[in-house]
UniProtKB/Swiss-Prot annotation:
Membrane topology of this protein: Multi-pass membrane protein
Origin organism lineage: Eukaryota, Fungi, Dikarya, Ascomycota, Pezizomycotina
PROSITE patterns in the record: DEK_C (PS51998)
Protein name (record): Chitin synthase 7
Single GO biological process annotation from the record: fungal-type cell wall organization
EC class (word): transferase
Domain of life: Eukaryota
Entry's induction text: Exhibits higher expression levels in hyphae than in germinating conidia. Expression is increased in the absence of chitin synthase CHS2.
Keywords annotated in UniProt: Cell membrane, Glycoprotein, Glycosyltransferase, Membrane, Motor protein, Myosin, Transferase, Transmembrane, Transmembrane helix, Virulence
UniProt source species: Gibberella zeae (strain ATCC MYA-4620 / CBS 123657 / FGSC 9075 / NRRL 31084 / PH-1)
Spans traversing the lipid bilayer: 741-761, 777-797, 1048-1068, 1444-1464, 1471-1491, 1499-1519
Alphabetical list of Gene3D superfamilies matching this protein: 1.10.10.820, Cytochrome b5-like heme/steroid binding domain, Homeodomain-like, Kinesin motor domain, Myosin VI head, motor domain, U50 subdomain, Spore Coat Polysaccharide Biosynthesis Protein SpsA, Chain A
Locations listed in the record: Cell membrane
GO cellular component: cell septum; myosin complex; plasma membrane
Length: 1781
């Protein structure tokens, strides 16, 4: 049982405030009330009743007065006694403000944030403005039920109205017709401008005066005395609250429609309503409510409609409450799963098993004084009911109340009998009649509504139960009181004056009327109440005899009543304090709490006898302020009022705090928490051995024996054997619809591959591995299919659409081969021939020789006239003589090439003399060289026919014929009949329709021949024309079918070219390199370390130390991912790191637990924390090192503590998240906080940026300042990266091919994405994130959502593996873009770093596999985001799509480039000018970039890159795609099947118990260990600013010898406190102060790995280098008594000195041991700076000089560069001097 001292226990006797005397009178009580009113305190008239006095003014300005002690008392009783409690918030005056929320805030546990949001959503339905109360509740009673575990933490919560419902009569139907009254607030919120214009138009809303329900009083605005009250602002908050409880979208539309319908229906409640208006209103309302208008107009009377309005309104409120309860339940589920903290801020580690027994506390607000009076008086004065009757029956002597009191009680109960469930009297019968009538009317409305309408769901919330209004979701108020222990919190009002008058009073407590208070006291009979309770009834606990003995037996109580009585006498309790009844033991509050306190301080091992008592279960460690017995991992407090609080005991318990915390941590002592979750890592590994100089890490891996090796990626080379479900715990997890659909799709494609084949042949024994292989196969197939489709689309699809496109050539294309001896093309009678292989042959049989001179002029010509056959052979059947030949219209330019055959052949010996030479010799030979058709554009044909020369060209279908030479011959020969051999009618078609398609006319002419002779003539003429006039075909390539593919390709080509051009322009940043001014933001430099070597680590740490940035404002945070020996190393990596940093090897900090990213039991991990100062080249920088060492059970494994880089990032992110939210922390995080806050001396909350680098990265000196300056200039930047170059660029061929890729990927891709503020991959090797937004301090990289998604433990699918195991850095960027799309993610090339590239093929292959696969899976995630900036095709969504497809189709790109090379080399197709231009543009732009940037070396790198293009674009992608499932699959959680919507998982370990990692808030931990640096409240700050009263010199670093303050020097004279931040108990004052003690320093100070001694002795900056004080010396100095004046400030150091001393050490000692971390070796004084500024301003021209120039001149004059506060002072002083000139 985890025992601890409750906050309540500290002041249990004091009751937390003034108490009632034994005998009370009205005057006495009146005086007491006046006193508590002036002091804003509660007054307890008995142990269970408190009185408070509040007005709206005190509540608004000073905070409502509430009794936190009563809340704590109710909580303690509930959890310790396992009994339900009920706190009644009664109001004795109609003007008292509501105390529901303030009272909830006083509970000593965190209230779920969703409860407050739910109340925000519900209260506008219940509150009204009245002349006496600006927010008067109109409900009968509203209850907030908090379900608690027996440990006292919240496990559930809900809201409910009592069965009495809401006073709709005064709040809606019949608002008093007096000024100052309003209806329910929700209606005014509906009508404000918060409603969108679309909503207002849809609802038809008007001004409030247009609605009868709102117009009765004529008051439409909030009271004027509330200067901040505004319905518009409140409506915005209300709408947001509705959204947060799930009322949004269509549900919200239905909700506001119903609300508007009720408002409009109110206009029909007047009996004299106009009939036309009445019908119009009913039509409108029926549309809004979704019911038939006839029901409203005809079936319901006016009185019925009044009942309908009231009933629907209550049903709507019940529905809103049900939605609120669902939202609360959802948050509680997330809290139980550890996804969220109770207050909704920060991630949470569950620390309690919340599945056990529970109790509940119900806080009931009863705003009506009459009902509250009746409830209270019946509880106190009625001896026939409840606990009073039980006590009387058990023998407790109770003095009866006076008859007058009894009569008043009976009359009070009778007045409100129906609300108390008493239905026997006249009022009850009337109420019952009204309820029955309401049910009939509501049932009629429900059945008249549309099926599945919102109205029907409102009225029938439970299917099959009919109208249940007033019962479903409501609570029985009398029943609740009778079944719970009742506590009363009663609120009085000091005056009857109107609230407006209170605002004019001189003080908030000036309002007082003794008569008013007296009337309230007498009305409720409070004096008699106090006297009766204190005399007879004030027993707050009761037990049966066995239960009492069982609980307190460990304290010496013996069995039986006699044993109890004896024990009572030993304790000094009288019979009045503890009464032994017939059956039960009755105990008053004082004795009961005294006994409980003794149980708390009793050692746990002596309480085993009550170990099974349900009332003694473990408590939630996240609450405790002072765990007295070292509960869990937390040590005992130094302040202990128990018998164990001696000095010896004090020293003993303090030694648990840090250096010796392991004793408490690992249950070394038998009295520590036997019921808490057992530690999985016993202490043996930590503390069994003395310090041996190994940093407490052991000697594992120190000797290089070759047992454990890791490759360059840190992958263990050993083998793992997986077991399946045998002897394992089987779990089922629900699957998302997307996952189920994907699994079904995978199986549909791979069903033909039997699983046994994969299992036995493929050696995939596990189902999850086989499933991943199937997924990989499907993805690989899809990618190959996509690549194939791309290639087919570019190369083959066009040919499929346009089959002969590559065999068609126009005259221009043919002419393009003129004078081309290697591509000799000619066109003859509409055909194109490639006679390249023929023209050189000696093919002439005459004296004419075939020479180049003769032949080349003919290349590219159309040679129809050179090969005209004899007409008598070409036009048979037309009676043409052999002497007839055509006269050509065009002159033959090369007569030697004319082939005239037949009669006119010049050489009779030639083969041309044969009249059939054209058909027998020429055509068979020329066909061998056929290359395609000669094509003409249709426009060319038409222009030839319609031009000035009007050539007779016509189309016959797609064929083209030209009769120009025939008609020209007739013209030359005067139409001599010998030459008129063609049919006249046919020739007329050419003459009359030139340029047109005559197919239809010609076919008609032939078919309509008069006789056979004419038909024969026509056919012969047509045959003749086909032989001598054929010109080619219409260019079909211009058809849509052939053009569409080219246009699509061209469109994409244009888009890609535009994107390329924009990328090029984005990369052009001319001008000199900017030199931003020095920045002063606090930055954490995170370095995750795994298996890197000493050289790489030293370079990385040295580069961070040497950064040109204020050393005090940067913190190096090294996180070692396990105790791992890297390849080539002779010791584990953590030891290498600690050696480099100079940590004393004898330092052995404890291993502390924290939650890791891992499967099941791997979530429990342990880590050690070291801190100190690291010096390099004169720079001294603080560092903190966290070494993950793992559990005890891991020490025999190869990599204890290793959980991956993602876990290292999450460790720091989660820590900063909890720092931001001030949430409970794990022990490791508490130690980190202590080291940073108290040892280093900087509040972790001051850090604003997180710089992430890899351990093999060297950062340029100005890089960090440039990154911070960019973020300071643009507050929207959430993440930013710089340029990463290679430091080993010339090491091997494999590094050389990467140089150009690194350069161009930054200056093109990232520069382009940065234009949109959406860099899709911020590399983990060099990226900086902003921790919080500037305006509101909203967490960014440390937000709950990012951490939750990034810390997913169950990485059991292929997609998750590629996201979270390969591409952590890219996925982190994806998550940031997902959760903060409105923020920017930038790249700046001026910030540079260098990293080492893979030097071997195997490592490069492994790296690119991770990069490519993670890129694909991350970009798929990015494509699902809804909000990415940009517009049209320049949206980042489009660019992401281009990047995604570009990565996937890399192989097809390589294939296509190969195809282009083939086409160009062989000339087998048209030259692809566009493709060549695109390739030229891409590489041309890239070349221009580095030429313009004068990066000449990249010319050579570019050539090497192009040579390696097939490797990057073909080999690496295909290898990566196929190896998507190449992971190490752990054996802890094995997915053995996915069936339906479930995933079956076999778990093979002890599991993870969240209780093994207890949580505690820093303030509680600091108080328990007397540590400085307590922070105050826990609520999230509303603005990320610290106010004027906050100085950074509140915490003093142990490394500093400067004046009191932090490392920032600050103002020594100031001594302000931490920024006030309201906590959940904001209204309460502390019961004790805190003062630093001389004993505050503990031995653990120097054992925490701080490295103080080592670093100080090495520092070149100490004044006396020869003197090296040892640790003992420092400790001795630490124990010096503080100087006089030690006060209550938090500002002391971790060494334990009082803040009253300006220095922790005497002046003589300062320089001996401390480097002045604030000032270095000094600097210019304020006066020197002022004098320099004045001198400079006197010398410069004030009209032209800039402030930056003045600053530079001042620094030049001072011969130093001012940073931090000194720079701020200089800037402020420059402004001051300029103002005074």
């Amino acid at each position: 049982m985890a025992r601890r001292m409750s906050m309540y226990s500290m002041a249990s006797e004091a009751m937390g405030g003034p108490q009632a005397p034994q005998q009370m009178s009205t005057t006495t009580l009146l005086n007491a009330i006046h006193n508590i009113y002036l002091s804003s305190q509660p007054y307890q008239i008995d142990a269970g009743t408190s009185l408070v006095v509040n007005t709206w003014l005190t509540a608004a300005q000073a905070g409502a007065t509430v009794d936190a002690t009563l809340a704590a008392r109710a909580w303690e009783h509930a959890r310790r006694r396992a009994e339900d409690g009920c706190v009644v918030l009664g109001s004795l005056h109609q003007a008292t403000p509501s105390l529901l929320v303030p009272f909830l805030n006083t509970f000593p546990f965190a209230i779920p944030a969703s409860i407050y949001k739910s109340l925000e959503a519900v209260q506008p339905f219940l509150r009204c403005v009245t002349p006496y109360n600006a927010s008067a509740p109109r409900q009968i009673a509203l209850g907030v039920t908090l379900t608690l575990s027996l440990g006292g933490s919240v496990t559930g919560a809900s809201l409910a109205l009592s069965q009495g419902g809401i006073d709709t009569e005064n709040g809606l139907l019949n608002v008093p017709a007096e000024a100052g009254y309003r209806a329910f607030d929700v209606f005014y919120y509906l009508l404000t401008s918060a409603s969108t214009p679309a909503e207002r138009e849809f609802l038809g809303l008007k001004a409030p005066s247009a609605y009868a329900l709102l117009a009765r009083s004529g008051t439409y605005e909030p009271p004027s005395y509330l200067i901040t009250a505004d319905d518009g602002a409140a409506a915005d908050d209300f709408r947001q609250a509705l959204k947060e409880i799930g009322i949004k979208g269509s549900v919200h539309r239905n909700f506001i429609s119903t609300l508007a319908g009720l408002l409009k229906l109110g206009n029909t409640l007047d009996y004299d309503a106009d009939s036309d208006d009445f019908e119009e209103i009913c039509e409108d309302v029926s549309g809004l409510l979704g019911m038939e208008p006839e029901v409203l107009m005809q079936q319901l009377s006016t009185e019925d409609r009044r009942t309908l309005v009231a009933g629907l309104y209550e049903a709507l409120v019940d529905w809103v409450i049900s939605k609120a309860n669902a939202a609360i339940a959802a948050q509680m589920l997330r809290i139980r799963d550890g996804d969220e903290s109770v207050d909704g801020r920060g991630v949470r580690t569950p620390n309690e098993n919340e599945d056990g027994d529970t109790v509940s506390i119900t806080v009931v607000e009863v705003p009506e004084p009459a009902l509250g009076r009746a409830l209270a008086m019946r509880t106190i004065f009625d001896d026939t009911l409840g606990i009073n009757a039980e006590m009387i029956e058990d023998g407790v002597e109770i003095h009866p109340a006076s008859s007058s009191v009894v009569r008043e009680m009976q009359q009070a109960v009778a007045d409100v009998a129906p609300d108390l469930g008493i239905m026997t009297g006249p009022q009850g019968r009337d109420r019952q009649h009204d309820i029955e009538k309401r049910e009939v009317i509501l049932e009629k409305a429900a059945y008249a509504s549309e099926e599945d309408s919102f109205l029907k769901k409102l009225l029938f919330p439970v299917e099959g139960q009919g109208i249940n209004l007033g019962r479903t979701g409501r609570f029985d108020l009398p029943g609740l009181l009778s079944s719970s222990r009742a506590w009363f919190h009663l609120a009085l009002h000091p005056t009857d004056d109107s609230p407006a008058n209170l605002a004019t009073l001189p003080a908030i407590t000036s309002a007082w009327s003794a008569g008013t208070i007296s009337r309230q006291l007498r009305s409720w009979r409070l004096p008699e109440w106090a006297n009766r309770r204190n005399r007879s009834l004030d027993y707050t606990a009761d037990f049966d005899v066995d239960e009492f003995v069982g609980r307190y037996g460990a304290l010496g109580c013996k069995d039986g009543k006699d044993g109890i009585e004896t024990w009572m006498l030993e304790r000094g309790w009288s019979n009045g304090e503890v009464f032994i009844g017939k059956e039960r033991i009755w105990v008053r509050e004082g004795p009961w709490w005294e006994a409980e306190s003794m149980l708390d301080i009793k050692p746990a091992h002596s309480l085993q006898s009550i170990g099974q008592n349900p009332f003694t279960s473990g408590f939630d460690t996240s609450y405790s302020a002072n765990p007295p017995n070292g509960s869990g991992f937390f040590p005992a407090p130094a302040m202990d009022n128990s018998m164990n609080g001696s000095n010896d005991q004090l020293m003993h318990t303090r030694n648990f705090s840090q250096g010796n915390m392991s004793q408490a941590t690992f249950n070394q002592h038998p009295h520590l928490n036997p019921q808490s979750a057992p530690s999985i890592a016993p202490s043996a590994m930590r503390n069994a051995q003395p310090a041996t100089g190994d940093y407490g890490l052991g000697n594992k891996g120190d000797t290089y024996k070759g047992q454990v090796f890791y490759n360059d990626d840190g992958d263990f080379t050993g083998k793992l054997d997986g077991d399946l479900a045998k002897d394992k715990k089987i779990e089922t997890k629900p699957l998302t619809f997307g996952r189920r659909a994907w699994v079904a799709f995978v199986w549909a494609l791979t069903f033909w591959i039997p699983s046994p084949l994969l299992k036995f042949v493929g050696r995939m024994r596990r189902p999850d591995v086989r499933m991943a292989w199937r997924e990989k196969l499907v993805l690989f197939f899809i990618i190959l299919l996509l690549n194939g489709l791309i290639i087919f689309w570019i190369i083959g699809f066009g040919k499929l659409l346009c089959p002969n496109a590559n065999k068609a050539w126009n005259v221009k294309e043919v002419a393009g081969h003129a004078e081309d001896e290697d591509a000799f093309w000619v066109a003859i009678f509409g055909k194109v021939y490639d006679i390249t292989d023929f023209w050189r042959q000696q093919h002439s049989d005459t004296s004419i020789k075939t020479t180049k001179t003769n032949m080349l002029p003919l290349a590219g010509m159309v040679m129809d006239n050179y090969f005209m056959p004899p007409l008598n052979r070409a036009c048979r059947g037309l009676g043409i003589k052999e002497t007839v030949q055509l006269t050509f219209n065009e002159t033959i330019t090369n007569p030697l090439a004319q082939h005239v055959s037949g009669f006119y052949t010049r050489d009779r010996t030639s083969a041309l003399h044969n009249a059939d030479w054209f058909w027998t010799t020429f055509q068979p030979k020329i066909k061998e060289y056929y290359h395609g058709d000669l094509v003409w554009k249709e426009g060319t044909v038409k222009s030839q026919g319609s031009g000035s020369e009007q050539h007779p060209w016509v189309m016959y279908g797609n064929q083209i014929y030209d009769l120009t030479d025939y008609l020209h011959t007739l013209d030359v020969n005067d139409n001599f009949d010998t030459y008129k051999f063609l049919n006249e009618d046919m020739v007329n078609l050419w003459k009359n329709s030139p340029g047109t398609n005559i197919k239809k006319d010609l076919d008609l002419l032939i078919s309509n021949a008069k006789n056979e002779t004419v038909a024969a003539n026509l056919k012969n003429s047509w045959q003749c024309i086909q032989n001598i006039a054929y010109k080619g075909i219409v260019d079909f390539r211009d058809s849509p079918r052939c053009r569409v593919n080219n246009w699509l390709l061209l469109a994409f080509a244009i888009i890609i070219c535009i994107v390329t051009a924009v990328k090029f322009l984005a990369a052009l940043q001319f001008g000199s390199k900017r030199r931003p001014s020095p920045q002063d933001k606090f930055v954490i430099c995170q370095v995750p370390v795994y298996t890197e070597g000493e050289d790489s680590l030293r370079k990385a740490l040295d580069s961070l130390t040497a950064l040109q940035y204020d050393n005090k404002r940067k913190l190096i945070c090294v996180i070692c991912d396990g105790v791992v020996v890297g390849e080539g190393n002779d010791r584990p990596t953590p030891k290498i790191v600690l050696d480099i940093l100079g940590v004393d090897p004898k330092v052995d900090p404890p291993a502390l637990p924290f939650k890791s990213v891992g499967n099941s039991a791997e979530q429990l991990n342990y880590g050690k924390v070291y801190s100190g100062l690291y010096e390099f080249e004169g720079n001294v920088v603080p560092y903190i090192v966290v070494v993950k060492v793992g559990k005890e059970s891991e020490q025999t494994k190869s990599k204890p503590g290793n959980r991956g880089k993602r876990d290292s990032q999450i460790l720091l992110m989660s820590f900063l998240n909890r720092v931001h939210h001030r949430a409970p922390m794990s022990p490791l995080e508490l130690e980190m906080f202590h080291q940073v806050n108290n040892i280093i001396g900087v509040d972790p909350e001051l850090y604003e940026y997180l710089l992430m680098i890899d351990a093999d990265t060297c950062v340029e000196e100005d890089a960090l300042n440039r990154l911070v300056a960019a973020c300071a200039h643009d507050a929207k930047i959430a993440g930013i990266c710089g340029e990463t170059a290679l430091e080993n660029d010339e090491k091997t061929w494999w590094t050389m091919i990467q140089v150009y890729e690194y350069f161009i990927s930054h200056h093109l891709a990232k520069a382009f994405e940065s234009l949109f503020g959406s860099v899709t991959c911020l590399p983990g090797c060099f990226t900086m994130y902003r921790l919080r937004s500037v305006d509101k301090g909203k967490p960014l990289i440390i937000s709950d959502g990012v951490i939750k998604d990034y810390s997913v433990c169950d990485v059991d699918t292929l997609h998750k593996k590629n996201l979270l195991s390969l591409g952590e850095d890219r996925y982190l960027t994806t998550l940031m873009t997902k959760y903060f799309p409105e923020m920017s993610y930038k790249f700046i090339p001026d910030a540079q770093c260098k990293t080492a590239a893979p030097e071997s093929w195997s490592v490069l292959l492994s790296q690119r596999r991770r990069w490519i696969n993670s890129t694909i899976h991350n970009l798929v995630e990015l494509m699902q985001l809804k909000e990415l900036c940009g517009f049209c095709c320049f949206s980042m969504r489009f660019v992401v799509f281009i990047d995604l497809t570009g990565t996937i189709i890399l192989p097809s790109t390589t294939v296509y480039i190969g195809y282009l090379i083939y086409v160009l080399a062989t000339g087998t197709g048209p030259i692809p000018y566009i493709s060549l231009a695109m390739i030229g543009a891409v590489y041309g732009h890239q070349a221009l970039i580095f030429i313009l940037k004068r990066q000449w070396q990249h010319i050579g790198w570019m050539i090497i890159y192009i040579l390696a293009f097939p490797i990057y674009s073909f080999i690496l992608p295909l290898y990566s795609f196929w190896n998507q499932d190449n992971f190490s699959w752990g054996n802890t959680r094995i997915v053995i099947g996915e069936k339906g919507d479930k995933q079956v998982v076999a778990v093979d370990d002890e599991g993870f118990d969240p209780r093994s990692i207890p949580l505690q808030r820093w303030d509680d931990y600091a108080m328990a260990n007397n540590l400085p640096g307590r922070r105050g409240g826990y609520q999230e700050k509303t603005d990320y600013s610290y106010g004027d009263n906050y100085e950074l010199d509140e915490i003093k670093s142990v490394y500093s010898a400067g004046p009191q303050g932090s490392v920032l020097t600050g103002m020594p004279g100031r001594n302000t406190y931490m920024p006030p931040s309201p906590a959940f108990n904001n209204g309460r004052t502390s019961t004790m102060g805190f003062q630093e003690s001389p004993m505050q320093h503990r031995q653990s100070m120097m054992s925490m790995g701080t490295g103080v001694h080592d670093m100080r002795s090495q520092s070149p900056y100490q004044d006396y280098p020869g003197q090296h004080p040892g640790v003992a010396n420092l400790r001795g100095q630490a124990n010096l008594s503080p100087a006089a004046g030690g006060g209550h400030s938090r500002s002391g150091t971790a060494l334990g000195f009082s803040s009253g001393s300006r220095s922790p050490m005497p002046d003589a000692m300062r320089s001996q041991s401390s480097f002045d971390f604030q000032h270095g070796q000094g600097g210019p004084t304020d006066m020197a700076i002022v004098e320099s500024i004045r001198s400079v301003l006197c010398e410069v021209d004030l009209d032209t000089v800039t402030k930056k120039q003045v600053r530079a001149l001042v620094e030049q004059r001072l011969q130093t560069e001012l940073v931090g506060e000194r720079r701020t002072f200089m800037d402020r002083q420059i402004d001051h001097e300029l103002e005074n000139m």
